[in-house]
Amino acid sequence: MDLELKNRVALVVGGKGYIGTAVADRLRAEGATVVVASRSAGDSPDSVAIDTADQASVDAGIARVLEQHGRIDALVVTAAPSAGTLDPARKSDPDQVLTAIDGKALGFLRVANAVLPAQRAAGFGRVVVVSGQNAYLSGNITASLRNTAVSVIAKNLADEAAGTGVTVNVVNPGTVTDTPSPEVRPGGPGDSSPQQIADLVAFLASPLSVVSGESISIAHRVLGQITI
């Protein structure tokens, strides 16, 4: 299926990471012009330095992409500190909670706020953020809140953009691994690979998708839990 991404400009924030690399590769395979954003841009002309924790860095990076390419048709945000950086012993520590929310949810908000005005002006845009199924799970306040906050922000942005041609959605993986297992544990989410995540992201980033305001689980959503 042609996703109609040929010659579209896609910015992948966190595009050097585990999931971000797969997303960037998938979008390139569809013919998109992909700009990869990370904290250090390197020498590639298709990369830009953006630190999502620093508003000035975000604004400068987005301005550079718009100057070079004229538009950002699709924004994909995969940048966030790894869950492995969270200290389980501090899962209810307010300082860790705030740091985690800033690193993931507010980092997304900073970038989205910088890109959305140009997308609205163009009458077209796709915003996709990769979060996680910890949003549905209790037991770790830090992990739950930083992912839930992403979904709340994305839904608000989607509603604000309703009717403008711009869509905003969240993709929530469970366990991400190169060798996903078909088995799903009770009380846990299913496995998915970076490439499987990238397939869903590419569709949501394409003109073919009119979905907006959704938080979509990839692989099995937490087994044994009903959320409406």
Where are these regions (language model features)?
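Active-site loop of short-chain dehydrogenase/reductase
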Residues: 8, 70-74, 119-132, 163-166, ...
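A glycine-rich helix->loop->beta "capping" turn
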Residues: 64-77, 83-85, 167, 210
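Rossmann-fold cofactor-recognition segment
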Residues: 44-56
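Rossmann-fold scaffold of SDR-type NAD(P)-dependent oxidoreductases
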Residues: 13, 72-81, 104, 129, ...
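C-terminal helical subdomain
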Residues: 163-166, 170, 186-226
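Catalytic loop of short-chain dehydrogenase/reductase
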Residues: 81-82, 94-96, 100, 105, ...
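Active-site Tyr-X3-Lys motif and surrounding loop/helix of classical short-chain dehydrogenase/reductase
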Residues: 60-67, 87-91, 95-103
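Conserved glycine-rich cofactor-binding loop
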Residues: 16
